Curated annotation (Swiss-Prot):
This is dITP/XTP pyrophosphatase. Its EC number is 3.6.1.66. Its cofactor is Mg(2+). Keywords: Hydrolase, Magnesium, Metal-binding, Nucleotide metabolism, Nucleotide-binding. It comes from the Bacteria. It holds the Pfam family Ham1p_like. SUPFAM superfamilies: ITPase-like. One of its GO terms (cellular component) is cytosol. The keyword RNA-binding does not apply. It comes from Deinococcus radiodurans (strain ATCC 13939 / DSM 20539 / JCM 16871 / CCUG 27074 / LMG 4051 / NBRC 15346 / NCIMB 9279 / VKM B-1422 / R1).
């Protein structure tokens, strides 16, 4: 697999969004509208298990599998929250943290692990990989720093959003509208880089 870093970008009309996470699908579909790309779901495609040790590896695994299975360009995201006091955990394991099944349970577990820590600095990281059926890859990364709250705030977003207060914001990511979130979020930054690279 190669990473496409420069030169003219390819013309894309249809792209597969390689995720089963409905929250991510909503964010990506709306953000890609300026490109005029027709976004398609996975259909019957089964994504491989995330076995990579980095966000880049996990996103590439999913994007490449979807591109090869469909014959279309595929866009995948891998993201996570890294908490300084926990040595960067849960990181790439954010979606599988504690082997529990729901966002609420993962949030409760993270808060429990933070109970004795006063340093609540954290950051969200997102890596988008756009894979083509011929194996070429494009990577885009975004990060946002902030603080882990002592309890959830807001019911918007998904994942760890209700626990995360971005630096300079009075709203948690769980209290923001989708538009507010995309303007500052890790995924919003990665998407902005993709849009710029493709001329939007």
């Amino acid at each position: 697999m190669q990473q496409q870093t420069g030169g003219r970008r390819r013309q894309i009309r249809r792209v597969v969004v390689a995720t089963s996470n409905a929250g991510k699908v909503r964010e990506l579909q709306g953000a890609l509208a300026p490109l005029g790309w027709q976004c398609e779901g996975l259909g019957a495609v089964t994504l491989p298990e995330e076995t990579g040790s980095t966000y880049e590896e996990n996103a590439a695994l999913k994007a490449c599998a979807a591109a090869m299975a469909t014959g279309l360009p595929a866009l995948a995201d891998d993201s996570g929250i890294e908490v300084l006091a926990l040595g960067g955990q849960p990181g790439v394991y954010s979606a599988r943290f504690g082997n529990v099944n729901s966002d609420v349970e993962r949030n409760v577990l993270l808060l429990e692990k933070m109970r004795r820590h006063t340093d609540r600095r954290a950051k969200f990281v997102s890596v988008l990989v756009l894979a083509y059926p011929d194996g070429k890859l494009e990577e885009y990364r975004g990060e946002v720093t902030g603080q882990l709250l002592e309890g959830p705030r807001g019911e918007s977003g998904f994942g760890y959003d209700p626990l995360f207060l971005p630096d300079g914001s009075e709203l948690s990511m769980g209290e923001m509208t989708l538009e507010q979130k995309q303007a500052i979020s890790h995924r919003g930054q990665a998407l902005a880089a993709l849009l710029a690279a493709h001329g939007a």
